[in-house]
Regions:
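Acidic, PIN/NYN-like endoribonuclease modules and their adjacent C-terminal/linker elements
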Residues: 2, 17-26, 91-92, 106-164
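PIN/NYN-family metal-dependent endoribonuclease catalytic core
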Residues: 3-57, 70, 74-75, 138-142
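Alpha-helix capping/helix-boundary segments
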Residues: 9, 49, 82, 100-101, ...
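Short, basic, glycine/proline-bearing loop/turn elements
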Residues: 14-18, 81-90
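Short, aromatic/basic amphipathic alpha-helical patches
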Residues: 59-67, 123-129
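Helix-adjacent hinge/juxtasegments
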Residues: 62-87
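Short beta-strand scaffold positions
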Residues: 77, 96-99, 115
Length: 164
């Protein structure tokens, strides 16, 4: 499965963890990163998230973001197709960086564009994103765990018990 994390998702572990939603999303993002490190997920990125963290005044956040982005198996270069799609997304109400993120993920044919931004989640679900789904990190981890459980169940039910 290919995943594109936007900057909001990558930075979630540094947000105020006193809110349950933020804490859950942070844990989910860290789990996604762990799955990428294990080779169970492929991380796609683009030039856009490489620009945004550089603008962050907090060095710890910058280092973390660049470390996550370094795990990407594919870096999507912005081209005229991505810019055109981003303009269309902008016309639908997405902010410029959000439109570039989503456009890059769609053009790269990522399975999932993961974000914690409510506005982007809402607009992304209302927008034509072809095969790319737009879930929260928590939803993504639930889907992965559910799929893993189903696969484990199928594997165990097809294994015949040995007769001794």
């Amino acid at each position: 499965m290919t995943v594109y994390l936007d900057t909001c998702s990558i930075q979630r572990p540094f947000d105020d963890q006193s809110q349950l939603r933020v804490a859950m999303e942070s844990e989910a993002v860290l789990r996604v990163i762990q799955l990428v490190e294990q080779g169970d997920l492929d991380l796609f990125t683009s030039e856009t998230p490489r620009i945004e963290p550089g603008q962050n005044p907090h060095s710890r956040r910058r280092r973390f973001a660049f470390g996550v982005l370094a795990l990407a198996t594919r870096v999507v270069e912005t081209d005229s197709q991505i810019e055109s799609r981003a303009r269309q997304y902008g016309d639908m109400g997405l902010r410029p960086f959000d439109a570039l993120h989503l456009s890059s993920a769609v053009e790269a044919e990522a399975d999932v564009f993961c974000t914690t931004d409510d506005r982007l989640l809402r607009r992304g679900s209302e927008t034509e994103t072809e095969r790319t789904r737009v879930p929260t990190p928590v939803t993504l981890i639930k889907e992965i765990e559910s799929r893993t459980l189903r696969l484990n169940h199928l594997t165990s039910s097809t294994t015949k018990p040995s007769s001794c």
